[in-house]
Amino acid sequence: MFCSALRNILRNSQNAAKNATITSQIRNLRGQQSVHHEVEVLTSPGITTKQNDKKTEPAECEGSKEVALDFRNREAHVPSFNLAAYVNNSSTLQQFLSLGVDLHSIERRKGLGDFVLKLDFEKNVKPYITFLVDQGVSPDDFGRMFTKNPLLFKEDLDDLQTRVNYLKSKRFSDEARQRILTQNPYWLMFSTRRVDRRLGYFQKEFKLSGHDLRLLATREPNAITYNMEHLRKSVFTLKEEMGFNAKELSDLVVRKPRLLMIPPDDLVERFSYIHQDMGLPHAQIVQCPELLASREFRLRERHEFLKLLGRAQYDPQKDLYISPKTIVEGNNFYFVRNVAKSDLETFDLFLKTR
């Protein structure tokens, strides 16, 4: 059988690869030894080196007067106390645990542990639960929402209702509003004016209709409140470095808005492999935006395996066509059985000999 013969070839190449690796390691070891001796001769025992471990991060801002809210990237720190030690004596913490809140995750973010500990469940938490239930949010989502954004309890309830009413005025359906609130608990921290500016930016930048704008915001609510500097860099990368035209860019971000949140360097790396190595044109990439959302090494592994089997055929006008989006669907077992039409043993041997 073809797969059996292929496995024999892969095993032989694997042994050859091992020998080559051993030889390379010996050479590297010899090189390291010689370098080590040189360093010992040149380094004086009285000389010490210092490293500056301080790291600065660029400030994130939306405009000259508005600082972007970045709740997710709060600096992790060693908590001064453990919330678990207060659970037995705090009915609020007990209620949070029953809702599925991850107290350990909260206490690792500076200042939030102390804030949560001071909350009174009946006065400071229960009204917000009632508000969320009225918006159609499922109680099953409370734990994840409060873990991500406990600062929600600082917001005025009237302001929260105003922000929900804004979404209603923009014709977001009940299901869309529920998804936005559960998938992005930080959305309610943004004023209606600020959300309006964000939605306006997306509509103008990508020339979206009202329907497409609502579709984008519902599919990936986090994109609307994401750091503006990052969004602008991603748009520049998609336009100028990858060469998508205005229509292609619009279709791309509506179908997969999460692409705007991926680091631009990663996008370029993936696009380069998809466009040059796999040979897919821009129009086909727009139809399969999942490719750009997948890690480059995963694309490479699966494409090269299909190429080895003679099945890397992505032209729909030819026989044995394979839809590019199926390459990144499912786990390895699904890919090998349903796309490559092979077996895991052959695929594992292929990965070991790469």
Curated annotation (Swiss-Prot):
Its main location: mitochondrion. One of its GO terms (molecular function) is large ribosomal subunit rRNA binding. Keywords: DNA-binding, Mitochondrion, Ribosome biogenesis, Transcription, Transcription regulation, Transit peptide. The keyword Coiled coil does not apply. SMART domains: Mterf. Residues 1-89 form a transit peptide. It is found in: Mitochondrion. Gene3D superfamilies: Transcription termination factor 3, mitochondrial. Belongs to the mTERF family. Binds promoter DNA and regulates initiation of transcription. Regulator of mitochondrial ribosome biogenesis and translation that is essential for development. Required for normal mitochondrial transcription and translation. Required for assembly of mitochondrial respiratory complexes and normal mitochondrial function. Maintains 16S rRNA levels and functions in mitochondrial ribosome assembly by regulating the biogenesis of the 39S ribosomal subunit. This is Transcription termination factor 3, mitochondrial.
